[in-house]
Structures are given as structure tokens and as C-alpha cells.
Curated annotation (Swiss-Prot):
This is Uncharacterized PE-PGRS family protein PE_PGRS20. The gene is PE_PGRS20. Gene3D superfamilies: HP0062-like domain. Residues 408-451 have a biased composition (Gly residues). Residues 231-320, 408-463 are annotated as: Disordered. It comes from the Bacteria. Residues 1-93 form the PE domain.
Amino acid sequence: MSYMIAVPDMLSSAAGDLASIGSSINASTRAAAAATTRLLPAAADEVSAHIAALFSGHGEGYQAIARQMAAFHDQFTLALTSSAGAYASAEATNVEQQVLGLINAPTQALLGRPLIGNGADGTAANPNGGAGGLLYGNGGNGFSQTTAGLTGGTGGSAGLIGNGGNGGAGGAGANGGAGGNGGWLYGSGGNGGAGGAGPAGAIGAPGVAGGAGGAGGTAGLFGNGGAGGAGGAGGAGGRGGDGGSAGWLSGNGGDAGTGGGGGNAGNGGNGGSAGWLSGNGGTGGGGGTAGAGGQGGNGNSGIDPGNGGQGADTGNAGNGGHGGSAAKLFGDGGAGGAGGMGSTGGTGGGGGFGGGTGGNGGNGHAGGAGGSGGTAGLLGSGGSGGTGGDGGNGGLGAGSGAKGNGGNGGDGGKGGDAQLIGNGGNGGNGGKGGTGLMPGINGTGGAGGSRGQISGNPGTPGQ
């Protein structure tokens, strides 16, 4: 077996020597070009002219070969220089890892946690992300499950400085993992993982509920809260995860996750609160869209024909989450999330041949209510209220069957209040009522938030 030892300094020195040799050869080649490629005939006869042309041709041929060799020499020198840099970088990395190993060894042995470095990402065997270094490092991300029913891994928390890891997505029908917390001094919380969608149900049976989204991680002294994960769709939609709280001194609250759609849709999560000194509240998550009603069954045909079945009513739409509160001194409240939309009721089933009556359409349910806007700090404006969702439309009747009733529109959310100086948040508009045999009523607009005690304008009420 043969061995090779590569010393980066020697490779760099050899590359420099090659470059110097190449420069000398190129200079000599250029100096000889005029004397070897443009020879004058020794006399005025034809023989002298042919001899001069022959030697000039040899000189030009040498110059062509010299140019090719110079290009090859440059490429070889460049490759050698790059190799020297690669070896030097690899050795520096090895030295860095060795130094970090020496630094981290005491805390790893005593506390099971390094002093500097990022936490490991979660795996199927160990789904939770590892914690970051005590002094510096980000938390590892939680594992996103591929097996139904298993909760996503939790993101690892940072130490003194660093961001929390993101939570992993849940498996089918399971909750998402929570985001890890940011560093005690500086760093943002990790985002929550999405909830898993619920598997479809068997014929005549509801589907499995979707998982809730994971909550966003909390920041330490300075930093933003993590966003909440979205709820999974399913027989009942999962709730959106709440946004994480911001750093104690400064930072914005995390935005909340959206509720999952489904038979009964999930509510949106609440936005995270800001810190003490400055920062805005997080936005509330939107409510999920209600599931549509199923079609009624057809009646049997024959001597005694059956009537068609009534279409199924829709599920309930999810409500929007509330906006997060601003920091105590400076900041605006977060906006409330919009209410989920209602869906259309199921179509009535057809009557059996021979005189069966068609079924009535299913009723649409009300749209979700908008979330309230967050309260402002001493200096800042309140958050806007969320818009109410539109009510679902009634399903069509089959034959002589009646159309279903429309659902009412969801109410708009209230605007957030200002404190000392600032404007109140505007109220959210109410949703429109759905169409049907008896149309739904439009939702009521949310009230505007109060103005600041010293100056500011009150929020405009929703329509």
C-alpha cells in the first residue's frame, strides 16, 4: 500500500515556484519570437527565400506550441494552488473541531450540553431537537413525523445566544411540535410545526380530526417570538398554534397559525405578546374553512319508490385568533385573525323513479367570528379586528326538494385599544350571510378600539 502526505505550505510554495518558472519561459518565448519567425533571406535568390521561409515557419510552429504549453502550465498551476487551499481549509476545519472539542468537553461531561455549537436535529428515534450550546448556538429542529398519530418533535432551545429550533410536523392526525425557545440574552423562538391532516373516514363515518399546530417558541431578553404552526385539516380541523412571546425587553410577538379546514374547522391561534420595552403584538391566525355538506342519498325506484335523502348540513367555520398585545411602552397591537368561511350545504338526493320525492338541500352554517385586535403600548395603536367569515350557502334541493337555508355571516372582531398616545384599532367587518331558502343574516361589524387618553383617534367600527 502506498501513502501520500500533503503539506499545504509545500504545495503553496511549489505553486509559487511554478508560476515564477512559467513567467520566465513566457518572457523568453516572447523575446525569441521576432528573431525566429521573421527571418530575412540571405540573398535575393529563390533558394535563400525558401530557406528563410522554412525557418520562419519552424519558429511560428514553436510559438504555437509554446502558447499551448503556457495555457496548460497556467491550468496546472491553478489546480495546484486550489488543491493547496483545499488542504489548508480541511486542516483548519480539523483544528477548529479539535479546539471546540476541548472547549466543550467539560460542560458536555458535567451537563450533557456543549458550550458552543448548534443542537442536533431530531430523528425518527429521537424526534426532539437538541439544545444549542450554553454560550452560543441554535437549537436543533424537531423531526417531522411520517407515521400517523405521532406528534412532531419539539425544537431545541438555545443557550445564551441563538435561535430556537423549529418544531416538526405531526404525523397524520397528530399535533405539530412546539418551537424551541430563543437564547436567554438574544435570539428568536423557533416556529411551531404544522399539525398533521386527519385521514379520511369510512363511508358514513366522519374523518379523523386534524392535529393542532405547535406553539411558537418564546424569546429571551431580546428577540421575536416564533410563529405558531398551522392546524391540520380533517374530520374536525386542528387549531392553529399560538405565536410565541417576544423577548422580555424588546421584540415582536410571533404570528399565530391558521386553523385547519374540516367538518368543524379549527380556530386560529392567538398572536404572541410583545416584550416589556418595545415591540408589536403578533397577528392572530385565521379560522379554518368549514367542510361542505355531503349529498343526500337517492331514493329506491320501484312499485313503492323512495324519497331522496336530505343533503347534509355543513360544519362550523373556525373563529379567528386574537391579536397579541404590544409591549408595555412602545408598540402596536397585533391584528385579529379573520373568521373562517362557511361552506355550501349538501345537495338533496334524487327521488326514486316512479314518484319518489327529491330531498331538500342541506343548510349552510355561520361563518367564523373575527378575532379581536391586540392592545397597544403606552405609545402605539391598537390592532385591527379580524373580518368575520361569510356564511355558508344552502344546498340545492333535488327535484321538488327545497333549497337549504343560508348561514349567518360571522361577526367582525373588536379593534384593539390604545393606551396613552395612539389610535384605536378599526373593528372588523362582519361576514355576508349565505344564500338559501332563508338567506343568512350579515354579521355585525366589530366595535372600534378606544383612542389614547392624551391624543389619538378612536377606531372606526366595522360594517
